[in-house]
């Protein structure tokens, strides 16, 4: 697994390259495909035209969904979009239809707690499993070519000090319920929120994830450019220092 932070191997020996773009936006490159998650700003690296690109959008919040991603199919020959059902797209479908492009053929709309299969150009199958977010939309669990990738979207342990105690209790229960669905699985790379706005509860979502999932590498996200929160997590959880990747800036 390559990134700006170093090099490692996935658990079946295949090398992946992970590029952090901004916020919750990441690009994962495998030997045979690209996967772009929750892009909303920043520079997308130039991609190999020979590889397929699958673009994932977990939900419609503006910090996870930028319709500019639909420009990518004009540049790259094989692009497929996987979007939560609540992401607005009718306007783009009409625009593309007026230009003679069938965007619907390049699109999969998803719902929570479902499994979808997408046939890739090499004949392989990309399996996409969705979890229910504790905020909006879905989280994604991908299986492809012996690799497993998890992107949480906004699925996290959202405990807010200005919310009633019973609200926060239900939130904690909902998050734990989703994590129980992942209990005992192995993932090669995961992208999980570590939001500093949660104050003393900031680390809880990532802690619970790591208690349930055996992960090769975990990239904290949704840190609102407060990258020191990642270093603090690793300092306070030294047992995870070889797993949690300490991002230090966008790009």
Regions found by a protein language model. Name each.
Residues 4-50, 105-186, 248-251:
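Core dinuclear metal-dependent hydrolase active-site scaffold
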């Amino acid at each position: 697994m390559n990134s700006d932070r170093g090099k490692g191997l996935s658990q079946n020996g295949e090398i992946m390259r992970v590029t952090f773009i901004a916020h919750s936006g990441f690009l994962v490159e495998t030997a045979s495909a690209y996967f772009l998650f929750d892009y909303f700003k920043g520079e997308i690296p130039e991609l190999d035209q020979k590889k397929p690109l699958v673009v994932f959008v977990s939900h419609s919040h503006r910090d996870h969904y930028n319709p500019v991603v639909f420009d990518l199919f004009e540049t790259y020959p094989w692009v497929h979009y996987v979007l939560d059902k609540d992401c607005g797209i009718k306007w783009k479908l009409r625009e593309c239809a007026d230009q003679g492009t069938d965007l619907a053929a390049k699109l999969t709309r998803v719902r929570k707690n479902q499994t979808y299969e997408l046939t890739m150009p090499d004949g392989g199958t990309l399996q996409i499993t969705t979890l229910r977010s504790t905020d909006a939309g879905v989280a994604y669990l991908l299986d492809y070519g012996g690799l497993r990738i998890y992107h949480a979207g906004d699925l996290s342990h959202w405990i807010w000090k200005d919310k009633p105690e019973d609200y926060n209790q239900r939130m904690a229960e909902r998050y734990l319920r989703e994590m129980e669905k992942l209990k005992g699985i192995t993932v090669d790379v995961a992208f999980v929120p570590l939001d500093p706005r949660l104050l003393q509860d900031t680390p809880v979502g990532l802690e619970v994830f790591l208690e349930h999932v055996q992960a090769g590498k975990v990239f904290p996200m949704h840190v609102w450019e407060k990258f020191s929160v990642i270093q603090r997590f690793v300092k306070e959880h030294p047992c995870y220092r070889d797993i949690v990747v300490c991002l230090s800036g966008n790009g």
